[in-house]
Amino acid sequence: ANRFFWQYQGRPVLLVGGSDTVNLFQWNETALRKQLDRLRAAGGNYVRNSMGSHYEGDVQPFAQCADGRYDLTRWNPEYWNRFERLLRMTQERDIIVQVELWELWATYGEHWKQSPWNPVNNINYTTENTRLAIAYPRPQYRNGTSYGKPTDFFLTLPELQDDRLVLTYQKRFAEKLLQHTLPYGHVLYCITNEIHPQYPPEWGWYWARFIRQQAAGRPVFITEMYWTPDFQAAQHWASLERPEVFDFFEASQNSALHDPEAHWRNLQYARRRLASRPRPINHTKTYGADSGPSWAGNDRHAVECFWRSLIGGAASIRFHRPPAGLGLSDLAVRHLRSARLLAEVFDFFRAVPGAEHRGLFGRAPNEAYLTSVPNEQYAIYFPDGGSVELDLVEVPGSFTLRWLNIGESRWTPAQEVSGNARLELQAPAKGQWVAVLSLRK
């Protein structure tokens, strides 16, 4: 088996998806069913689910007292019933769920003001007997990194601030979550959403150990989502260098890079770093939508990132929710369909991405990307038409060439081409295409 990819029910599986919210489990049953059925019909099999409850209308995990404060020792059944429903409905549809335990953004600004974990909002602790404050300002950003004091919620561990009281309730929450997830075999675990570089990596390592202890020998697959887009940055060493702690690498922030070649190189760097002990590289978010903020990029950025990730050897790729992503929009659905069409004919599980673009001649920046099962199959992605030469000089035999029109999810008629040559590949038109060459047996 290729350990850069997931196995599910004994078979290798490529995970692609899109969804319209961060915390799908919070939706009512009708809306949830509609979303999951739409995803499945598009060939999607992967969703993200943050356990956050910081948006308007979200239900909280804890019971409320008469005075409106929360009691962290009592559960709100509605929250956990909704979570259980998501687990059941995704399992029935063979959709893999990547669950995020902790939500960084719930500890800042307005979200923290409303949070049950805020000392003013519960009956279980105060600012006197814990390290937690009533308010935390959001981080500041400059020169591609983040500044500002960390929130104490992520510093409760014995080796950090040793805030045992808050940690007791955090462990109760994690135990309850795992009571729901551990009976299922289609769950991936991510510790935190976008933990920033000013937070010590011990937080993620601690909860990875905690999940493994609770799992008591059952297989679990765990990662941490670091905020820094550049995978060569020190923050990512905490994951890349620790295969015994994290079972896969979360590469979501790669799509925050807007230079297409940098986006490709970043993913190939992660693959190179993991090559001696391969692990799946997941993208639970792919940013970009015309509707979104400028930092996220536009529609075109999103779909190009999706295809570069696919050709580049990603194990999972999901369109982020609107407005900063395409979610499960009509455009996203078209691209999911096309990805599935390609995966039906091209063997991603045996393929090696052309990290340095060797084998492609006459290539301009962001013109074409190659992955191949050497001497057998070649897939070349063209983000916007163009032409390159594919080096088949040392490769004998004849090949079937087909073009996938990505925007329309359909194939052109097959043609026969010969090896032992530099083969010119000219995209049939502008727009996004994949050329697939398969050796004729």
Name what the model sees in each region.
Residues 2-245, 257-258:
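Active-site mouth of glycoside hydrolases
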Residues 49, 191-192, 251, 283, ...:
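Conserved beta-strand positions
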Residues 52, 194, 254, 286, ...:
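Flexible loop residues that form catalytic
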Residues 89, 273, 308:
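Hydrophobic/aromatic ligand-binding patch that stacks against planar heteroaromatic rings
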Residues 197, 248-257, 264-300:
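Active-site clefts of carbohydrate-active enzymes
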Residues 226-232, 254-256, 287-288, 383-387:
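Short beta->alpha connector loops
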Residues 241-249, 276-280, 312-316:
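Glycine-enriched alpha-helix->loop->beta-strand junction motifs that scaffold or abut catalytic
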Residues 279-281, 288-292, 298-415, 424-441:
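Aromatic- and carboxylate-lined catalytic core of secreted/periplasmic carbohydrate-active enzymes
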